Amino acid sequence: KQDGSDEYNIDPIKWRVLSNEKGVQSDNGDELFLLADQNLDVIRYHETNTSVSVTWAESTMRSWLNGYDASYNTGGNSGIDYSADAAHSFLDSAFSEEEKNAIAGTKVENSTGGETQVQIFLLSLSETRRTVYGFSRDISKDPGRVATNTAYVAGGGKTGSTLMSEEDGADIWWLRSPGLTGDYAAFAYNDGSVYSNGSHVNNENFAVRPAFKLNLEEVLFTSAAVGGKVPDASGSGNCGGVAVGEIFEIASYDGDDWKVTVLDKDRKFAISDVEISGDTVTFSYSGARTGKNEYISAVIVTNGELTHYGRVLELDGTANGESGKNKNVSIPSGMTLDADTELYLFNEQYNGG
């Protein structure tokens, strides 16, 4: 959305789950197949001013989505470099390093033959017709394929198009499949129908709706998209506030929107010298990351379900640093840690409830 300075804020991206591939045999283990819930940018399928035949593998779209250098595409005279900095590619501008580590490399089939290995991709024509993904088999109008615009897209996005619909209005979005000829690519209409004949690859008025597969082994836990890290006001025990140092019962949630907390394997956080006395857990720690919004946090898992959360120690680099001894965590009153109820401590960057 735009702020008062006419600049666009970087809001969290909402992703639609097309399939839960937990337990499905794949190269990466358990995965979620995700598609952007809205159109996220406006960009040509291929950056060219001439009529050239191009495949998905050679397109500047694939390079821009994944931050590839000029050797991966045939844009311009000798390829276009999208690896220089975060402003150049979708991958680097939309995801942190930790989030990128949770994106599974995916082999996507190309209708022109062969496969390409990518992290971020566009849906194919056939994928937009699979009922298991929530789409209609028919190529005609389908509400499940309708994609609305973010404020950035409504404002013209990367190409500066003046023909985009308003914010939350529906627009056309690219597919990776080729169109009728080699210089055309397929797309989905703003009414949810799909058009296999496609449009010219240098069309600057079509939106982008990226997709990727999330490696669930890189996910620490999930929480409600709104209120997932805030207390249940009707709960019992130590759940009346959000102050640092408290572990509270997480509010109940029956919605469909979730956010994930991903692992950061570069962190060297470790816990030692753990002692439990009544409702108090005493511990020492080392290898913590300090700075803005850095904390030692805790979750309690009961019978496999996440029930409690709290930020127990602020690591601002002043009072608490990279290591510490004899720190305390208070377990909610009436709760006992055992084989069915476990406490986990971890170092996180807190980005809101």
What label would you give each PLM region?
Residues 340-344:
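Short, conserved beta-strand segments of beta-strand-rich sandwich/propeller modules, principally
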Residues 1-337, 347-350:
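Collagenous Gly-X-Y triple-helix signature in extracellular proteins
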